[in-house]
Amino acid sequence: MNKLYIGNLSENVSPPDLESLFKESKIPFTGQFLVKSGYAFVDCPDETWAMKAIDTLSGKVELHGKVIEVEHSVPKRQRSRKLQIRNIPPHLQWEVLDSLLAQYGTVENCEQVNTDSETAVVNVTYANKEHARQGLEKLNGYQLENYSLKVTYIPDEMATPQSPSQQLQQPQQQHPQGRRGFGQRGPARQGSPGAAARPKPQSEVPLRMLVPTQFVGAIIGKEGATIRNITKQTQSKIDIHRKENAGAAEKPITIHSTPEGCSAACKIIMEIMQKEAQDTKFTEEIPLKILAHNNFVGRLIGKEGRNLKKIEQDTDTKITISPLQDLTLYNPERTITVKGSIETCAKAEEEVMKKIRESYENDIAAMNLQAHLIPGLNLNALGLFPPSSSGMPPPSAGVSSPTTSASYPPFGQQPESETVHLFIPALAVGAIIGKQGQHIKQLSRFAGASIKIAPAEGPDAKLRMVIITGPPEAQFKAQGRIYGKLKEENFFGPKEEVKLEAHIKVPSYAAGRVIGKGGKTVNELQNLTSAEVVVPRDQTPDENDQVVVKITGHFYASQLAQRKIQEILAQVRRQQQQQQKTAQSGQPQPRRK
């Protein structure tokens, strides 16, 4: 996304005019300006500079009497599901933006882009081309808290080329402000980004590094020359987040490439930092710092630290990991610090990232398998998988994620609270609670649920009961994190599925509805969800006239079974209310068949 389209140009504009404009604005460019009638194209060194050009020039600079517009250049066949929305009010709540985007279709992914501007920028992926077209049409120029939104297409590498007949059938768009529409720029010329691009493999996990701020200039080089050379040498895309955490001693770098490309770029960056340190007489050690989502760190460390110790021994390095207490809901990454020579650190990076990629692929495989079973829940928003803001590819890259506006309850309605008893290995209680209760408190805040661990039933009890109280989405978040934590901390083997038993209480009069005639309903539940569902016979109802339903299975199976049982209970309650109303009105009740 480093290629720019410059529109609304006067007929008199020449390449030297545009070169002068970019130089005055201190925006580097590569190659020549390709000027057409009323518009032009140019390449920037990287995506960061392209965004800088858009923020600095678009709608703000006049050239030969016309205010120019600058945006990402998108080949026609890649104008599909992906949009970039700029000029978003800086303090806007995510829920407000999500609900606005959902008005025009199903949103599969929404990620914030780091820019120099005060306003926010997001990249949005809709479920299909028509939803994206509606979003572009309705949101471009939309007034939100006195800010006018600016919406453009960005390349969708997963888009399938249209047949000539489809292209003829599709009407060309007219931009609301009257300039050349997106459908009127003609075909992408040779060399357009993505002209021969293939979809990225889903398993591509970027490498995230932290580097001392004083070395960022050396890594970029004069007018971006050094970073440009690194990207060419290693066939990678490198984002240096210079504006993140203003004044911080370290800045994050995200490297997108194959595992080999990421490792090669990492090694070159370490060499540049070492040379710059020598030139500036910087005497402190410069360790390699890798950022990794907390979801993967437990598996990287391994039981009793075995995995990490092996990497240290094999690579002759010293590796430490930042404490859990440093995590927040907004920063779910931990810092893996590797000390050693450049050669040994490079080897350690390969081994660390290999483990992280394996963990990521296992999680995505589980999500691919079961995501379609739970409609109406926003899987991307639940935090069970790494958010794309931390540099991880969003799960929606390979999943038809059921993210819809149904993820939010109707305005004015509060979803009913539920209580679930989840049974975990007794040995895992310490991991769930965390040091001084930090983990369970953070989990409770994250999920929006009450989470308590019941006392052990006896000194030899192998299981402990976790009592989770909250609405459906809070249950999903809390239980999902508990399943994930047990896997991370190796309470289950690397190829073993985490299966837990959950108990939910139902009114005794509704137990028959859960079982169904001759066990039909409970059998259908088991076939649909892959969970084992048991309503023990001859139970004595408790003081609240409730009996227990036992559900055993992996996370998604258990969740689907819980939701289906809650649907049955809601149906029973509605029928009861209807019967009460009918009885009060004195009308005869219809007989149940």
From Swiss-Prot:
Q: What is this protein called?
A: Insulin-like growth factor 2 mRNA-binding protein 3-B
What function is annotated for this protein?
A: RNA-binding protein that acts as a regulator of mRNA transport and localization. Binds to the RNA sequence motif 5'-UUCAC-3'. Preferentially binds to N6-methyladenosine (m6A)-containing mRNAs and increases their stability. Mediates the specific association of Vg1 RNA to microtubules. May regulate mRNA translation. Binds specifically to the vegetal localization elements (VLE or VgLE) in the 3'-UTR of Vg1 and VegT mRNAs. Binds to the Vg1 and VegT mRNAs in both the nucleus and the cytoplasm. May regulate mRNA translation. Acts as a transcription regulator.
Distribution of this protein across tissues and organs? Expressed in oocytes, kidney and pancreas (at protein level). Expressed in oocytes, kidney and pancreas.
Record keywords: tRNA processing included? no
Keyword Flavoprotein present in the record's keywords: the answer is no
Task: Show the ranges annotated as biased composition (Low complexity).
Answer: 161-176, 390-402
Q: Which family does it belong to?
A: Belongs to the RRM IMP/VICKZ family.
List every stretch annotated Disordered: 159-208, 390-412, 571-593
Alphabetical GO CC annotations of the entry are:
cytoplasm; cytosol; endoplasmic reticulum; nucleus
For molecular function, the Gene Ontology terms on record are: DNA binding; mRNA 3'-UTR binding
Q: Which residues form the RRM domain?
A: 2-75, 81-156
Species of origin reads: Xenopus laevis
Q: Which GO terms describe its biological process?
A: CRD-mediated mRNA stabilization; mRNA transport; nervous system development; regulation of translation
Which InterPro entries does this entry report, sorted A to Z?
Answer: KH_dom (IPR004087), KH_dom_type_1 (IPR004088), KH_dom_type_1_sf (IPR036612), Nucleotide-bd_a/b_plait_sf (IPR012677), RBD_domain_sf (IPR035979), RRM_dom (IPR000504)
- What Pfam families does UniProt report for this protein, alphabetically? KH_1, RRM_1
What are the entry keywords?
Cytoplasm, Developmental protein, DNA-binding, Endoplasmic reticulum, mRNA transport, Nucleus, Repeat, RNA-binding, Transcription, Transcription regulation, Translation regulation, Transport
